[in-house]
Amino acid sequence: MASTTGGTVAVVGATGRQGGQVVRHLLAEGWRVRALSRTPAGKKGAELNGLGADVVYGDLEDAASLDSAFAGVSGIFAMQPPGAASIEDEVRQGMNAARAAARASVAHVVYGSAGPGDAETGVRQWDAKLRVARGMNDLRLPLTVLRPMAFMELMVDPTFYPQSSTWYTMPRLAGVDRRIPWLSVHDLGAIAARAFAEPERFIGKDLRLAADVKSLAECRQVFRSVKGKNPPRFPMPLFLFRRFVDDDILTMWRWLRENPVDADTGPTYEILPTAKDVRAFLQAAS
């Protein structure tokens, strides 16, 4: 199948984890990248500029900034950064990007979504992304939706506080034996770049992505096997943990306990044969 590179892709959320990986993979494959940031002169913006990206101002609450950032691009990687105060705020931000993409008549939008599927769950961040994807389809955008469930970085990234979150509170609420589909942020970036390179293959697709499906108990066993010790845990009372995280995270974990989610890893490996399972991810993170 024909592969297309060499155009310009605008990346929303470029200084975050997901957007940052998308930027890196696109640059590595020969794309020109316009990286959107609310603080383009900041440290993270300077880092992306050093990699070769054109870092520009872009704010999902500022339609004019999106029109400027999207002008002349062939593709857009769209997502809503975390932290919206309400589902309405997140949907508004996502649709601001969608309408700007429509005004720019871009050839391909790759949307970073999340969650289990097509039905709303009561988990705000999942439901907001579902509504945005529907809105993008209503606008008839040439769309690919990437829908991971949980990122492997939750196990090791200190900014996620895995000692108190992934290895302590999450198993208490979601269930230690509940099987969860996992994908690394690195592999999400690689899959996004692949989608832009092969638009005729991916436009119109809603891709549920998983490179591994394991319970937290199984992940704990793999962690011990790879690193020679159990993952660190810091027991924190739930009332105290809630001071550090959005209640929507707790809603998500409780939803997982009551709603089994399985996934077929085959389609992900068809797109990216080098995708890492939990063991390979933890080995690389050692």
Locate predicted features.
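Short, conserved active-site loop motifs that form the nucleotide-linked donor/cofactor pocket
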Residues: 52-53, 143
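Cofactor-binding loops of NAD(P)H-dependent oxidoreductases
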Residues: 58
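Acidic/proline-rich low-complexity IDRs
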Residues: 35, 47-50, 271, 281
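Oxidoreductase cofactor-interface core, primarily capturing Rossmann-like NAD(P)-dependent enzymes
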Residues: 2-47, 61-64, 69-73, 80-91, ...
